A protein has these predicted regions:
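Walker A/P-loop
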Residues: 17
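Small-molecule kinase domains that catalyze NTP-dependent phosphoryl transfer to phosphate-bearing small molecules
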Residues: 68-69, 127-174, 181
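ATP-binding Walker
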Residues: 11-14
C-alpha cells in the first residue's frame, strides 16, 4: 500500500488534535504539528506558550527565513517517515502546503464545527494558558487573526470536509470513511 498523508486544516478547536490522537492510537501513525516547532522554540527560551506568542514566533520565523520555512521542515519530516499513514495537523496558510501537496498520497482535509461548540471545547481543554478564561467574544476576535482568516480559504480547497458538531463516534466514523476512500485497510 502506498503512503497516505492526511493534512488537517481546521478552525480553532474544531477537532484536529482529537482526530490526530485517534489515528495515532488506532493505527500507530506519526503526527506532525506545525505548532510543535514553535512550542519547542518558546520552551527553549522559557517563554509562555500562549496563542499570542505562538503567532509571534511564527511571524518572526516566516519574515526572517521565508514564508515557507515551516512547510519545508514538515514536508521533509513527512517524506522521510516510513509509516503507511501520516498525519499533518495545524495547517493554517497556503504556504503550509506548498511542499506537502507535491508529495504522493497527500490529501487535504477540512475540519469544522460551529463557533460556540469550538469555544466550549477550547475553554475545557486549555491547551494554551490563556484559554481557560477566554470569553466567547474574545474567541471570535481571535478568529480574525491573520492565520485564522486563511483557514476557511484553505478549507475550500480541501478534498474532504469533516463536520464535527456531532458525537465523538460520528467524528471517528467520518475519518474512517475517508481512510477507506483512500484505500486504507484497518
Amino acid at each position: 500500500m502506498s503512503k497516505i498523508i492526511l493534512g488537517f486544516v481546521g478552525d480553532l478547536a474544531s477537532g484536529k488534535g482529537t482526530l490526530a490522537k485517534y489515528l495515532q492510537e488506532k493505527y500507530h501513525c506519526n503526527t506532525y504539528r506545525f505548532s510543535t516547532m514553535l512550542r519547542d522554540i518558546l520552551n527553549r527560551i522559557y517563554v509562555e506558550n500562549s496563542r499570542e506568542n505562538l503567532q509571534l514566533i511564527s511571524k518572526i520565523l516566516r519574515e526572517n527565513f521565508g514564508q515557507d520555512v515551516m512547510s519545508t521542515v514538515i514536508s521533509k519530516d513527512v517524506e522521510n517517515d516510513k509509516n503507511e499513514l501520516v498525519v499533518v495537523e495545524g495547517i493554517r496558510r497556503p504556504t503550509d502546503i506548498t511542499y506537502l501537496q507535491n508529495l504522493l498520497g497527500f490529501h487535504l482535509i477540512y475540519i469544522t464545527a460551529e463557533p460556540k461548540t469550538r469555544w466550549e471545547r477550547m475553554v475545557k481543554r486549555q491547551e494554551n494558558p490563556d484559554e481557560k478564561d477566554k470569553t466567547f467574544e474574545q474567541f471570535l476576535l481571535d478568529e480574525q487573526a491573520e492565520a485564522d482568516m486563511l483557514i476557511k480559504e484553505l478549507g475550500g480547497k480541501a478534498e474532504k470536509t469533516i463536520n464535527n458538531d456531532g458525537t465523538i463516534e460520528e467524528l471517528y466514523s467520518q475519518i474512517e470513511n475517508i481512510l477507506a476512500d483512500y484505500g486504507h485497510k484497518n
